[in-house]
């Protein structure tokens, strides 16, 4: 035995592993024949007896000729030294003086090369078969240290594999052991020429033992700058794995000292600390084995990945076992694709990949793959590679196949077998998580709006499925293209839902009476029944007339600001024959109104004065029909048009006011132009847009207050909240019929309603109190009227006094209905976010148009420039004062909402969403009020 000293050891030892000054290692004789020819150098090594290579009689059963067989005990120990010490790497640097010896480094190159040689088929670009072990010309030149004795009763092969299994994956003092396992393979090497070492991110074979930290040694990284041989197969890759070149890759290269052979590659890596510290070998019964598999196969498959071989026994056994043990896999599909080529193959064929570059669909990841980056079974892709997800189409599916899940399947339950061109993606099964709805397959790049999450219910009602196609525009929703999805999907930017009932609905509630509404894959939102009349609960009987079905809603005329109204009767929806008695009506409604007014009939409604008046049912209830005619503004003395003449209508509109942009109230010249009247015009024509506002005005809404019980603070507040919820639905429905409002972006529509709903409610309260009780009481609803005595008895008397100011102002100013309607629309448009709206231009045009309509409404009663300008100032000043008044209501409402449990006050769902999301924003000054006058 001869001592071999390494000069200038660079790599540090493992902590706790002592460095012996001398390590004896058996050195076999140096052979001058192939497969490692080299030039003679001055550095000669002492010749010692060659050692037999035996892997427990598995690989090479015979020993070299001319050698005496050692005794059994010596041979067993030497076999351990040979197998584990083979390919030992000695760190040597060229230095002048001083030498220190250390234990040479161990490597798993022999086992990798032997298994590669044993399993890889011969062919172009493949590894060459290893020469016979008994030939002198191609014998293995091995040297390595002596290993500590192992526990008796364990075979040499099992002890070696147990040690290889129990190694750590990193070097001493190096925290990047895991990262080393994911290094990129060098270009020019096919996957079949490399053994794929498992990492923590790689999957395990079914039935194989899973260790707590399965870290295996990765390919050694060469970090030297320029120490490479001229005849080497390839340059050293800086910071990349070193490839075995030349004959070393084919027949298993032997580690040769530096300078011994000119044609070979002297591997001078860092020290591998996986063999520096003593270890305890695993006994056979310690390692769990899969049933029907030998201990060797179980241990080897747990240690390495099987290379890409189409007919390898290990691959066939693994695939067969996988299909037998995987319960969730379908038998028919498994029989068809059980032995399909692995995913790492660039094509779906089973032809071995020749040596060369990797396909362009594979690239090196920037970071380590996640633990769930690969499926549990059937993935032979190298851990350092991942497939590009940007490829699309059938060609990309064939190159980078992915398993498509069926309904109710889990992503981890299927092996990743290659498939052909994918079929159309089926709709996803109904999920089990709350808040998630069944949707059809959509592109992953679909953007989701980041607006407030409280507008979900409003959005559901604003964009419900209608019979008529929606108005096309820059923000119009595209039509549905999912006939088999079971629901109407609107693929547009939408808001997430926060309601609890929506989660229950998505989790498996009974189907609604109309197609399920899911916006951009979001769950079905609350208050679905409020969209259609048929699904409305019984608690809303007075509101049934207003919530018409979609078939009736689609008959409503669509108006624009600069265009004339359509030929549709504003009373029954039939085709209009002209403007009769100041309103665009049909001939039937004209005759009915004339006879009813001239005959002075007292009609009584058999219902609740909320009957539906349309083309079919207009003769059912004359009382409701006459009431609707009066609400639309029909007057016996009004001007009549025998025919629907556009020219005469335009002349009548020009006589009322000129369509010029609105200006500041003190601009007398502009106001004089707008309020120019014909001297002989006795009766003014109501503008068509104001007539439309009259026709879309909501009907009476009841609070449902129980008068049989004494009034308490909680009962009154709960009744007011229920009334507010119904009025909020009424505001949404009214805004949808408002000309110009649907031209705004859906997010802007939701924002405007959320900011102005309280102003609209208190403004409507003031109008009802002014019209019905002359401002003496608060007329919340026909069944909830508070006089001054009931106000004092309530707990919100100060709040009632604040709201009472509005009807008193109406009484003082004697506001007309036309003025009220225009002011109501301006209240909807009087608060915007600080950053503005998405469709700010359309919003400003809409607001300017309704300001002009307010001026027209003022001109119907005021004659002259000065009275008209004064009237305009008074009405707009009232609108500005409403900001401060409504702010007090917001503060009280938010405090009551926070203390609702303690006060036993119930808040409905939609109102709760709006209060929780928008009131803190409004009270914090994060909105911009639009004022007519400076404070």
Curated annotation (Swiss-Prot):
Residues 689-935 are annotated as: AF2. It holds the Pfam family zf-C4. Residues 220-231 have a biased composition (Acidic residues). A motif (Nuclear localization signal) lies at residues 183-187. A motif (LXXL motif 1) lies at residues 55-59. Residues 191-203 have a biased composition (Polar residues). A motif (LXXL motif 2) lies at residues 115-119. Composed of three domains: a modulating N-terminal domain, a DNA-binding domain and a C-terminal ligand-binding domain. This is Progesterone receptor.
């Amino acid at each position: 035995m001869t001592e071999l000293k390494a000069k200038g050891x660079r790599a540090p030892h493992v902590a706790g592993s002592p460095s012996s000054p001398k390590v004896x290692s058996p050195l076999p004789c140096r052979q001058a024949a192939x497969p490692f020819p080299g030039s003679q150098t001055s550095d000669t090594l002492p010749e010692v007896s060659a050692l037999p290579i035996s892997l427990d009689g598995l690989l090479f059963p015979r020993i070299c000729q001319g050698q005496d067989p050692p005794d059994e005990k010596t041979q067993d120990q030497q076999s351990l030294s040979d197998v584990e010490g083979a390919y030992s790497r000695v760190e040597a640097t060229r230095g002048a003086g001083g030498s220190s010896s250390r234990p040479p480094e161990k490597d798993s190159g022999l086992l990798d090369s032997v298994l590669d040689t044993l399993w890889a088929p011969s062919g172009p670009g493949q590894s060459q078969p290893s020469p016979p072990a008994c030939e002198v010309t191609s014998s293995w030149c091995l040297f390595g240290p002596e290993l500590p004795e192992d526990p008796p009763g364990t075979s040499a092969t099992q002890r070696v594999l147990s040690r290889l299994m129990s190694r750590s994956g990193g070097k001493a003092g190096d925290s990047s052991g895991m990262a080393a396992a994911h290094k990129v393979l060098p270009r020019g090497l096919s996957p079949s020429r490399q053994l794929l070492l498992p990492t923590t991110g790689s999957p395990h074979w079914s039935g194989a033992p899973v260790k707590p930290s399965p870290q295996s040694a990765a390919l050694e990284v060469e970090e030297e700058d320029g120490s490479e041989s001229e005849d080497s197969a390839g340059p050293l890759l800086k910071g990349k794995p070193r490839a075995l070149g030349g004959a070393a890759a084919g027949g298993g290269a032997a580690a040769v000292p530096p300078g011994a052979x000119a044609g070979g590659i002297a591997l001078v890596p860092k020290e591998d600390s996986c063999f520096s510290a003593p270890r305890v070998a695993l006994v056979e019964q310690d390692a769990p084995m899969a049933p029907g598999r030998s201990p060797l196969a179980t241990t080897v498959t747990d240690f390495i990945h099987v290379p890409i071989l189409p007919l390898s026994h290990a691959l066939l056994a693994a695939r067969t076992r996988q299909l037998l043990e995987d319960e969730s896999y379908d038998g028919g599909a498994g029989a068809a694709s059980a032995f399909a080529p692995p995913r790492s193959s660039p094509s779906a064929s089973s032809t071995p990949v020749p040596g060369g570059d990797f396909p362009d669909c594979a690239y090196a990841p920037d970071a380590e793959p996640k633990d769930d980056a690969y499926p549990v079974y059937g993935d032979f892709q190298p851990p350092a590679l991942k497939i590009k997800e940007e490829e699309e189409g059938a060609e990309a599916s064939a190159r980078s196949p992915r398993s498509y899940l069926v309904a109710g399947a889990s992503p981890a339950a299927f092996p990743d077998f290659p498939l052909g061109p994918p079929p159309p993606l089926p709709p996803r099964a109904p999920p089990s998580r709350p808040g998630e709805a069944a949707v059809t397959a959509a592109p992953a790049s679909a953007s989701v709006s980041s607006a407030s999450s409280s507008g979900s219910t409003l959005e559901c009602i604003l964009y419900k499925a209608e019979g008529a196609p929606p108005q096309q525009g820059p923000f119009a929703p595209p039509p549905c293209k999912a006939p088999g999805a079971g629901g109407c999907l609107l693929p547009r930017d939408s808001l997430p839902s926060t309601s609890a009932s929506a989660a229950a609905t998505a989790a498996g509630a009974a189907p609604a009476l109309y197609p399920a509404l899911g916006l951009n894959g979001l769950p079905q939102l609350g208050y679905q029944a409020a969209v259609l009349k048929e699904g409305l609960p019984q608690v809303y009987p007075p509101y049934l007339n207003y919530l018409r079905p979609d078939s009736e809603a689609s008959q409503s005329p669509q108006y624009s600001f600069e265009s004339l109204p359509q030929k549709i009767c504003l009373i029954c929806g039939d085709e209009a024959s002209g403007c009769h008695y100041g309103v665009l009506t049909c001939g039937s409604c004209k005759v009915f109104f004339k006879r009813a007014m001239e005959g002075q009939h007292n009609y009584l409604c058999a219902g609740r004065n909320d009957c539906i008046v349309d083309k079919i049912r207009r003769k059912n209830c004359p009382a409701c029909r006459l009431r609707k005619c009066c609400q639309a503004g029909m007057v016996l003395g009004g001007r009549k048009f025998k025919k629907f003449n556009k020219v005469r209508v335009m002349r009548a509109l020009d006589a009322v006011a000129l369509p010029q942009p609105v200006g500041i109230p003190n601009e007398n010249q502009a106001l004089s132009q707008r309020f120019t009247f014909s001297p002989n015009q006795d009766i003014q024509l109501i503008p068509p847009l104001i007539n439309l506002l009259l026709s879309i005005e909501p009907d009476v809404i009841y609070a449902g207050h129980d008068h049989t019980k004494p009034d308490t603070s909680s009962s009154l507040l709960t009744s007011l909240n229920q009334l507010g919820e119904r009025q909020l639905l009424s505001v949404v429905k009214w805004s949808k019929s408002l000309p110009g409002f649907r031209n705004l972006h859906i997010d802007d529509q939701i924002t405007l309603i959320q900011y102005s709903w309280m102003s609209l409610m208190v403004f409507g309260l003031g109008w009802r109190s002014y019209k019905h009780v002359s401002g003496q009481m608060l007329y919340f609803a026909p069944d909830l009227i508070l006089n001054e005595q009931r106000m004092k008895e309530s707990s919100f008397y100060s709040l009632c006094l604040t709201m009472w100011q509005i009807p008193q102002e109406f009484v003082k100013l004697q506001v007309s209905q036309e003025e009220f309607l225009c002011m109501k629309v301006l209240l909807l448009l009087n608060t915007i976010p600080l950053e503005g709206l998405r469709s700010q231009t359309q919003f400003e045009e809409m607001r300017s148009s309704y300001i002009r309509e307010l001026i027209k409404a003022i001109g119907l009663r005021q004659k002259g420039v000065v009275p008209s300008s004064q009237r305009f100032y008074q009405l707009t000043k009232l609108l500005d004062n409403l900001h401060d008044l409504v702010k007090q209501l917001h503060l009280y409402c938010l405090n009551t909402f926070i203390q609702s449990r303690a006060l036993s006050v119930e808040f409905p769902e939609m109102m709760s969403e709006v209060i929780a999301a928008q009131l803190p924003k409004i009270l914090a000054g994060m909105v911009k009020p639009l004022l007519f006058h400076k404070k």
